[in-house]
From Swiss-Prot:
Species per Swiss-Prot/TrEMBL record: Shewanella baltica (strain OS155 / ATCC BAA-1091)
Region (Disordered): 460-488
GO BP, sorted A to Z: ribosome biogenesis
Protein name per Swiss-Prot or TrEMBL: GTPase Der
Quaternary data: Associates with the 50S ribosomal subunit.
Coiled-coil stretches noted in the UniProt entry, renumbered to this chain: none
Keyword annotations: GTP-binding, Nucleotide-binding, Repeat, Ribosome biogenesis
Annotated ranges, domain KH-like: 373-457
Signal sequence segment: none
Function recorded in the entry: GTPase that plays an essential role in the late steps of ribosome biogenesis.
Residues annotated to bind GTP 2: 205-212, 252-256, 317-320
Length: 488
């Protein structure tokens, strides 16, 4: 699973500055979907090849009554759930009583902790940081978060233990060729292999929207404790099941509540668990309460699922028992506020009575198949050429932008890499046109599709392809399926 990094410290030591710097690479993705809000406390970051969830825990006001009462419950929860804690201090202000109390709490939790002395720009950093060694948490790492100094080195060092285990691609490796080219026959065989794997389905949403009720309806038994009170699911529950010959792993996540409404520490843990479940899933099923409409929390969860590139299905629950006027208003609100995700199927269901639940799986399978479908290089290049024939790229400085070659750059979500001349100058309107053209041509439903543009000629032309070990294993699996099919 993707690691979680918690930023801990007293107020005004630079936690939010570091959070914004780490997560800003994802802002552009969110901006691609107008009307979408994001949760400023939880973010998905990508730095130096490492991908992780970063949590800004908020500050601690004082120490008079002890760390347990002064640290926000959300901060306690984040520390418990985090894989790595960055304990941030202010090198200019020096060591404070609050720093000592926080350090005492962190030592008692035995978490992997790194002391960060922030704001070292313009001062004698070594002298200013010396006193922080007395915290008893090991080495003190110098940083100037506002300028980005020391940030990359800190993250690389903190997350090194997760690199090999998680198969993280380090920056500098060629991400474009990470997914090898498929022939038509190999793509078909690989798709068949993927259809035999269980679909990991994360059911997410605010508390009390009916996630556990829906899980029980799907399973046909009381597998998840359900009470008519928000937050009764304490942890993400992984439940294997089979339906009409297809295997699934249902991930029933604890509800995400507004921070102002969360009073029990155990319930706050569920926020991070939900975000980690999204990362672990193939398909995300977002449940919305028909009686409450679309809340900001719904949009925040939606944004995280989109940023993670997960296939998506939306279910509007509790559709039974409301009058037609309310139904019309809900549908109008969905059209107005969720028009930017027109690729996702929307279902109106009653988890309690089972109305419409069966049709969910048609969309879930459709979304999974679209997100993981292997497409040959020749097919992608043909579609690219057809899009040019139907609508030529614009002129740039009197020269026509020329698209030469397309190939797959990744899956779940599908990524198409397009090579050509002056592609960096293509207007957003033409990029959207091409994205929609690929979506229609490939019949991609239920998943975002990403286009990446690279300058230059076909990088594979007149070049012998050297496969990585993982690519070689995938090639052998595809060839094995082809042989098995031919012998039958």
């Amino acid at each position: 699973m993707i690691p979680v990094v918690a930023l801990v410290g007293r107020p005004n030591v630079g936690k939010s500055t570091l959070f914004n710097r780490l997560t800003r690479t994802r802002d552009a993705l969110v901006a691609d979907f107008p009307g979408l809000t994001r949760d400023r406390k939880y973010g998905r970051a990508f730095l130096s090849g490492y991908e992780f969830i970063v949590v800004d825990t908020g500050g601690i006001d004082g120490t008079e009554e002890g760390i347990e009462t002064k640290m926000a419950e959300q901060s306690l929860a984040a520390i418990e759930e985090a894989d790595v804690v960055l304990f941030m201090t202010d090198a200019r202000a020096g060591l404070t009583a609050a720093d000592l109390s926080i350090a005492q709490h962190l030592r008692s939790r035995e978490k992997t902790t790194f002391v960060v002395a922030n704001k070292v720009d313009g001062i004698d950093a070594d002298s200013a940081c010396a006193e922080f060694w007395s915290l008893g948490l090991g080495e003190v790492y110098q940083m100037a978060a506002s300028q980005g100094r020391g940030v990359t080195n800190m993250i690389e060092y903190a997350l090194t233990p997760y690199a090999e285990a998680m198969g993280i691609v380090r920056q500098g490796e060629d991400e474009v060729t990470e997914e090898r080219e498929y022939t038509e026959e190999e793509a078909e065989a690989e798709q068949k292999r993927l259809q035999d794997l269980p679909i990991k389905l994360a059911i997410i949403g605010k508390p009390n929207v009916g996630k556990s009720t829906l899980t029980n309806r799907i399973l046909g038994e009381e597998r998840v404790v359900v009470f008519d009170e928000p937050g009764t699911t304490r942890d993400s529950i992984y439940i294997p099941m089979e339906r009409e010959g297809r295997e699934y792993v249902i991930i029933d996540t604890a509800g995400v509540r507004r921070r102002s409404k969360v009073h029990q520490v155990i319930e706050k843990f569920s926020v991070i668990k939900t975000l980690k479940a999204v990362e672990d899933a193939n398909v995300v099923l977002l449940i919305i309460d028909a009686r409450e409409g679309i809340a900001e929390q719904d949009l925040g969860l939606l944004g995280f699922a989109l940023n993670a590139g997960r296939a998506l299905v939306i279910a509007v629950n509790k559709w039974d028992g409301i009058d037609q006027g309310i139904k019309d208003r809900v549908k109008s609100e969905l059209d107005r506020r969720l028009g930017f995700i027109d690729f996702a199927r929307i279902h109106f269901i009653s988890a309690l009575h089972g109305t419409g639940v069966g049709h969910l799986f048609e969309s879930i399978e459709e979304a999974y198949d679209s997100a993981t479908r292997r497409v040959s290089t020749s097919m992608l290049t043909r579609i690219m050429q057809m899009s040019q024939d139907d609508h030529q790229p614009p002129l740039v400085n009197g020269r026509r932008v020329k698209l030469k070659y397309a190939h797959a750059g990744g899956y779940n979500p599908p990524i198409v890499v397009i090579h050509g001349n002056q592609v960096s100058k293509l207007p957003d309107s033409y990029k959207r046109y091409m994205m929609n053209y690929f979506r229609r041509s490939l019949k991609v439903v239920g998943t975002p599709i990403q286009l990446r543009f690279q300058e230059g000629d076909n990088p594979f032309e007149n070049k012998t392809e050297k496969l990585t070990m993982s690519q070689e294993r995938r090639r052998k699996r595809a060839q094995s399926h082809i042989k098995d099919r031919k012998t039958k």
